[in-house]
Amino acid sequence: MLFQTYGDSRNPAVLFFHAMGVTGASSEPVAKYLQDRYFCILPTSTVYCAGQKYVSKADEIRQVEDFLHRQGVERLAMVVASSIGADLAMAFLTQTKLPVEHAFFDGGQFAQIGKGTRRITTPFLYFAIKSLYWSKGGTLKKILWCDDDSIKPYFIAAGENLTYTNLRRQMADSLEYKPFPPLSKELQKHTYFEFGSIEDHFKYRQAVMEAYPCGHCPVFEGYNHMQYQIRDPKGFAEMLAHIAECDCIDRKSVV
């Protein structure tokens, strides 16, 4: 993995888990608005790191925890996960011994997919991600609701380093067809599973609500997948800070 940090390591820590097909730097626009108050940690999965080998989710978590330990992080003010980053974040939350005060999932991909289906879809995912590199972001509109120039560099960088073997290994132990991992009721009370009302991942909301009945499942009406985060990183960052500091979501920040 590769790690970027923003802010003073003495401040409360916020750990980001990025979406599929992008690098950890995709959280930079949000982290830059938090860095005055928080220590932001942005890991990039080994899947998108040149010369690195993806082993397993457990190994990814080990690398994250090793980095947090080296940085002197003893607790996390918040874990923020976007799209498929939810899969790794959930594994982290259920395995880490570090206290986690809040968690926020933005359009989490809480899919439960059979092994055979994951294996079949891997070549298509690989081609889609690599095509973003080959076309310098020109094919983004074909796989996402927007093709903003501001986010293309993160897709291009990820596609450049992606290997088929690493993606195949990641898909072999991601989005597995099994019950969601358990979260304590106390952590659920401080966890937010947010979905945009018009995004495809909205279909996972009911299953999430049933698995984590004490959690919060806000809906951003009229918003697409990760739209608030992409189009208004400042507002998104302010919302995260409000959750961390007031333990509630500030709906006035979402218009």
Feature map (PLM): residue ranges:
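Conserved alpha/beta-hydrolase catalytic His-Asp/Glu region
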Residues: G114-G116, L132-K185
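Conserved serine/cysteine hydrolase catalytic core
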Residues: A172-E210
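Conserved HGGG/HGGXW glycine-rich cap/lid loop of the alpha/beta-hydrolase fold
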Residues: Q4-A50
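Catalytic histidine-centered segment of alpha/beta-hydrolase-like enzymes
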Residues: Y223-F236
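Active-site loop/oxyanion-hole signature of alpha/beta-hydrolase fold enzymes
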Residues: I41-M78
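Gly/Ala-rich beta-loop-alpha elbow adjacent to hydrolase catalytic centers
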Residues: V80-G85, A89
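Flexible "cap/lid" loop of the alpha/beta hydrolase fold
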Residues: T94-Q95, V100-S131
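Conserved small/polar residues in nucleotide/adenosyl-binding loops
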Residues: K252-V255
